[in-house]
């Protein structure tokens, strides 16, 4: 991102000819005298997302060992406000890992909405921190917000998918990795991640600059965090973040994500068209989307019962192969491919 140079006559920082930190002293300044501002722009070799960082440090003559360490403020290209899609300003340690995200605060410079980590996840929903309003989703979404279903998901629930033709997590992961080869080294978002079954696999592979485990269910994210904490292959440097967000309002800037994965998820979304349109928006040019779901009926389903089965399952967003392709292409994705096994379908498409 192009940045205007800092001038010696003003403490304002200008980004694309707009004030970067206008009148936000209460959120980003200390109680002591105004610090000097040091600007740096950096781009990671493995990441396509440059960031602007500002370090607030005291003048050299005032530095002593007892003073508070410098405060870092960053406009990140990873997260955006789910209300206005402006990049969020971040106060705290940098990095996409559990410890850094937990210790950071986020604020939108456009609408002034603030976001912070709960005990287990960063809440980037439009309804974050609302006290009196509780949004209820369709039953297919609300089911997975249940503590019981969230607990059982990797303890028997997911294993039952094999009866519908799902190959199993290890094989599904291997298949997805084949489609994601061109996205290696970039940012991967695992939408509707559930308890993080595939998010953990993607993070453990070490092939991505960051992995975002994203779900709307608070209890699924608690399970995700618990599995990560109990896995000794993860440490504070592992590039994985746990985020609560709505798939139809993804908290990422347009064109900023290299890969999106949605395992056994499409049939749970209130509006698959809205969700896939959002996925297309956040993908960069050439970015890859891979998803799996249940078909309304399998190729082996007797023709005589297909109309009845279709009538029942269509209301729960169980789609067919041609419908999934139509939704992807109508939302701007190209190069659609799929693989079908019984009622299981893995499909992929990319942003041109």
From Swiss-Prot:
InterPro entries: Methyltransf_11, SAM-dependent_MTases_sf. Its EC number is 2.1.1.-. SUPFAM superfamilies: S-adenosyl-L-methionine-dependent methyltransferases. GO terms for biological process: biosynthetic process; methylation. GO terms for molecular function: S-adenosylmethionine-dependent methyltransferase activity. It is found in: Plastid, Chloroplast, Plastoglobule. It is an enzyme of class 2 (transferase). GO terms for cellular component: chloroplast; plastoglobule. Belongs to the methyltransferase superfamily. This is Uncharacterized methyltransferase At2g41040, chloroplastic. It comes from Arabidopsis thaliana. The lineage of its organism: Eukaryota, Viridiplantae, Streptophyta, Embryophyta, Tracheophyta.
